[in-house]
Swiss-Prot record:
Signal peptide: none annotated. Its EC number is 3.1.11.6. It comes from Clostridium botulinum (strain Alaska E43 / Type E3). This is Exodeoxyribonuclease 7 large subunit. Bidirectionally degrades single-stranded DNA into large acid-insoluble oligonucleotides, which are then degraded further into small acid-soluble oligonucleotides. It is found in: Cytoplasm. The lineage of its organism: Bacteria, Bacillati, Bacillota, Clostridia, Eubacteriales. The keyword Nuclease applies.
Length: 399
């Protein structure tokens, strides 16, 4: 009997039919540990269920996921009820889950929590030990795979933000047995290279098993003891590793790590302009203040200099001279006025003027003015003053 040649669709549909008609495979209860958990925007939940030897992909559709009463997380031990089938589009075997019940925590999750608690108590996560990320890094060391998307993302973001920054790659395995040793070697290499400003350690997302190298205690201690600041960019935003907690900064993605490490060149230019403007203002203000103080000191110096004192003394003498001359002039004017007034008074009472009117002044031999007739009661020699001269004679009383 000749067997018909099948198409891929024929094969996957046949296998799906066989599985779908199997009673046991349609009524499964499977126990295992959740790994690579993803919550899709559609509401569906995707994850892997594993034990020490095997792993199977699982999906829980939105209608069933909305009824869950347990918060799923990587490393959780669960019991899943559902059915097995083939997803014909990819030919992948997977479990379609109807119920999920929590059984406990997986071995790796327990190990992760134990190391996290140990390092936390030892101070490995303390903020006081975190190193500052340099504001303007010129050379950035990256420890990651040379073929993955991580290094491409970091280079692309860096070129876009500031093409003047150099990226130096230390190629290392980021998955598989002992990959953490290569990551350690990369960190130690850059710490010996004095031209590096900071280090980015990263890889893409994955299951807890795929990211486990970043949970190794030896790597955590090397990150903690690094002299250079380290940005951890492991997995996606929902993924957390021990390296994230112990590093100086945790980035949700490698692209974000580059954004943290590399400021925009336009922002740098703006900052330089603002600083230059501020410095120019401060310099001008300082010069203005210095000039003002200099002028003030010059004025003070002039006021207190010997020559200034001499000049001021001369000025003071001149003022005093002016005041003295003014006072003398006033005094002279006042005295002149007094003299003129006295002259007028004398002139008004001048005997000559009286004599001009026809009067005469009679004096005895002793020059006493004869005012009354009683002074001439006997014969005397008299002098008579007239307006144009004097005459002398003898006075003889009439009997």
């Amino acid at each position: 009997m000749k067997i018909k040649t099948l198409t891929v669709s024929d094969l996957t549909n046949y296998i799906k039919k066989v599985i779908d008609n199997d009673f046991i495979l349609n009524n499964l209860s499977v126990k295992g540990e959740i790994s690579n958990l993803k919550f899709h925007s559609s509401g569906h939940i995707y994850f892997s269920l594993k034990d020490n030897n095997s792993k199977v992909n699982c999906v829980m559709f939105k209608s069933k996921a909305s009824l869950l009463n347990v918060a799923l997380e990587d490393g959780m031990e669960v019991m899943v009820k559902g059915r097995a089938s083939i997803y014909t589009a990819t030919g992948s075997f997977q479990l379609y889950c109807d119920e999920i019940k929590k059984e406990g925590q997986g071995e790796l999750f327990i190990k992760f929590e134990a190391l996290k608690e140990k390092l936390s108590k030892s101070g490995y996560f303390d903020e006081k030990y975190k190193k500052n990320i340099p504001m303007y890094a010129k050379r950035i060391g990256v420890v990651t795979s040379s073929t993955g998307a991580v290094i491409r993302d970091i280079i692309n973001v860096t070129k876009r933000r500031n093409p003047l920054v150099d990226i130096i790659l230390y190629p290392a395995k980021v998955q598989g047995d002992d990959a953490y040793k290569e990551i350690i070697a990369g960190i130690e290499y850059f710490n010996k290279n004095k031209n590096i400003d900071l280090i980015i350690v990263g890889r893409g997302g994955g299951s807890i098993e795929e990211l486990w190298n970043f949970n190794e205690e030896e790597l955590a201690k090397v990150i903690f003891n690094s002299k250079l600041p380290i940005i951890s960019a492991v997995g996606h935003e929902v993924d957390f590793t021990i390296s994230d907690f112990v590093s100086d900064v945790r980035a949700a993605t490698p692209s974000q790590a580059a954004e943290i490490a590399v400021p925009l060149l336009s922002d740098i230019n703006t900052k330089i302009y603002e600083i230059s403007k501020s410095l120019d203002y401060e310099i001008q203000k300082k010069l203005k203040d210095c000039k003002s103080r200099l002028e003030s000191n010059e004025r003070i110096l002039k006021l207190h200099s010997p020559m200034s004192k001499i000049v001021n003394s001369y000025l003071e003498v001149d003022k005093l001279k002016d005041r003295l001359y003014f006072a003398i002039d006033i005094k002279i004017k006042r005295e002149k006025q007094k003299i003129e007034s006295l002259n007028n008074l004398l002139s008004a009472n001048n005997p000559i003027k009286v004599l001009n009117k026809g009067y005469a002044i009679i004096e005895d031999e002793n020059n006493n003015i004869i005012k009354e007739i009683s002074q001439l009661n006997e014969e005397k020699e008299i002098s008579v003053s007239l307006s144009d001269g004097n005459i002398k004679g003898n006075f003889i009383p009439i009997k």
